[in-house]
Structure formats: C-alpha cells, structure tokens
C-alpha cells in the first residue's frame, strides 16, 4: 500500500487521548522506526517505564518478523519479544502521503528512534533538521553500527561483527580455542540500552531548555564501553586479556566445577567465603595452607588449587553439595 488505509486524523485523536499518568514516562510518545533488536530494545525498555511507543514499519515489515528467528506459533519469537507493549503502524515513508502522515505524528510526539545507516534519514527527508522544523521539542535518536564518521560508517553492522571487531570475542570462550561470541546478542542489546539512556538524558535536558536535541550512538561505541576494565588493562599497561572460560582473571576460585551429575559455580572472592568453602569441603588444611591463604595467593597458585577442588566436587551430586552450602 502507498500509505495507511485508515483516517490519520482519527488516529491522532486516539493517540492524543491515550495517556495514563501512572508511570515515570507517562505522556511521552515515541515513534520507533527501528528494526530487529538494536533499534527496538531501547523502545521496549522505555515502554516499560510508561512511554507510549508506536512502532512504524515499512509495507514490507520489520526484518525481525522472519518466522525462522526463534519461531513461535508461526510467528517470530524475536519480533514478539522486542515489540511487546507497543502500538503498531505501517507507513510508506517513500510516498508523499506516507511522509505527511509521519510528519503529522512528529508534531505530537516527543522522540523518534531509528537504526538506519548514515544518509538514509536525509534521503527520506526525516533527518533532525527536517523534523525540528515541525516540532522544535522533538528528540531524534539514531543507533548505527559504527557511527556517522570514519571508514566503517557505511558498513552494515551485525551483532557478531561488532562483538568481533570490538575485541569481545577475543576474550570470550575457552583458552586455546577459537573465538566465541557471547550467548546473547550483546552488541544489539547494548545499542538498545545505550539508546534508552541517551533518550532519557535528552528528555531531562529538554525539561531545562525547552527544546529537543539529536542523540547519536553506535553499537561499536557501546561495546567498547562495556569492555570496561578489560579495555583499561590494554590501554594502561598493554596487558592483552585472554579468554578464561568461566574462570576469573583476578579471583580464585571463580568458575564452574563438574559435580557427579552436573555443574557447580563457585565464586569465593572474599577470604571469608574461601574459609566457608573449605569448611563445606571438609578440607580445613586448605584454608590454612599458605599457598591459598589470600585471594592473591590463590591466583598465583591457581594451577595447583583448581585441580584439588575439581577432585573434590566430582565426588558428589549437585543436590548433595547444595545442601551443605
């Protein structure tokens, strides 16, 4: 269809009257042009805070609607997950009629979110400079893969690509094994979380200034931020982190251990927890052993201590161990 098949004026009246001031973001209206995860997760988080999120799809639909992605009763489980609690519209932004409908929505909305590649907003005539002429209080948030500048800016960004180029995959997985991706689409989710954070900051700024602003963020920047102290290790002392499996670089014991019928995850950062663990293991000599007295001692003697613990945990079932903790 060229545009919506129903009366846009009636729609606007319904939307304008559908506010319930019971949540932190009640009364905030968000137009979401995003797709898949990175462009939709932020809207989901804001809808949980009470914002009215109107998901706007092209006539061909969100790519996340592919039924092969986490299928559920003939639908996409991914789409259902990230678009719950949202209203839905179909608008052909490439048509004059569709663009006018979108402009009318912008006039009565607070935020517009997208995850288009750089340059698409300008082609569709929905860039920030165009939208602010319609509503100077509008906030526009764009989630890109690599930002709007630099040699990678025009490249498509998939979660695994961002995980790899950010360095995350280099520190994920088992030692001496190929790089592994995190089990959830953390780059996509990170982009969504950071977009919601940026939108909240922009809404707060608008309360003080009375005007909107543009929020730009990239999935790549989000992942660099989430690297946190791992990135600091490299930037400060050129110490390159390596994959540790479930182990921790600076805490021992901190990993999964095999029991007779499953796995136990042990995390004994403080020495008092270490002493408690030794008591549960009925191995008091471990706590008094000078090689394992402090966490630093245990880190330095990891290769000696871990096999001792592995020999202990494999003797009993998970349920038996949990009874003693």
Residue positions per predicted region:
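Intrinsically disordered, low-complexity segments enriched in serine/proline and basic residues
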Residues: 2-9
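Oxidoreductase and adenylate-handling cofactor-binding alpha/beta cores
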Residues: 192-212, 225-237, 278-285
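Residue-level marker for the onset of beta-strands and adjacent loop->beta junctions
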Residues: 78, 213, 252-253
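Conserved Rossmann-fold dehydrogenase catalytic segment
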Residues: 148, 176-186, 207-223, 242-249, ...
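Aromatic-enriched alpha-helical interface/lid elements that frame and gate functional surfaces
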Residues: 252-324
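Glycine-rich beta-alpha junction loops
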Residues: 60, 146-147, 219-224, 261-263, ...
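Short Pro/Gly-enriched beta-strand edge/turn motifs at strand-loop
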Residues: 62-64, 235-241
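N-terminal helix-loop segment corresponding to the beta1-alpha1 unit
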Residues: 10-208
């Amino acid at each position: 269809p060229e545009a919506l098949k129903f009366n846009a004026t009636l729609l606007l009246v319904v939307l304008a009257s559908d506010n319930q001031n019971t949540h932190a973001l009640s009364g905030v209206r968000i137009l979401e042009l995003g797709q898949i995860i990175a462009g939709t997760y932020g809207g989901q988080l804001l809808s949980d805070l009470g914002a009215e999120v109107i998901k706007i799809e092209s006539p061909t639909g969100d790519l996340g609607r592919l039924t092969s992605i986490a299928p559920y009763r003939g639908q996409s489980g991914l789409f259902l997950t990230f678009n719950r609690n949202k209203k839905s519209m179909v608008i052909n932004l490439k048509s004059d009629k569709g663009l006018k409908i979108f402009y009318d929505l912008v006039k009565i909305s607070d935020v517009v979110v997208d995850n288009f590649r750089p340059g698409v907003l300008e082609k569709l005539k929905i860039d920030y400079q165009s939208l602010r002429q319609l509503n100077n209080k509008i906030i526009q948030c764009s989630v890109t893969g690599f930002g709007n500048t630099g040699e990678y800016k025009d490249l498509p960004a998939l979660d695994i690509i961002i995980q790899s180029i950010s360095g995350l995959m280099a520190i994920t997985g088992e030692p001496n094994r190929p790089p592994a991706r995190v089990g959830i689409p953390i780059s996509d989710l990170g982009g969504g979380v950071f977009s919601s954070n940026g939108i909240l900051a922009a809404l707060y700024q608008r309360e003080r200034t009375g005007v909107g602003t543009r929020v730009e963020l990239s999935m790549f920047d989000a992942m660099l931020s989430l690297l946190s102290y791992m990135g600091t290790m490299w930037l400060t002392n050129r110490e390159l982190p390596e994959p540790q499996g479930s182990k921790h670089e600076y805490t021992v014991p901190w990993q999964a251990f095999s029991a007779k019928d499953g796995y136990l995850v042990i995390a004994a950062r403080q020495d008092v927890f270490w002493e408690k663990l030794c008591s549960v293991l009925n191995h008091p000599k471990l706590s008094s052993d000078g090689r394992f007295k402090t966490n630093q001692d245990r880190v330095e003697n990891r290769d000696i201590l871990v096999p001792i613990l592995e020999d202990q945990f494999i003797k009993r079932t998970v349920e038996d161990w949990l009874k003693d903790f």
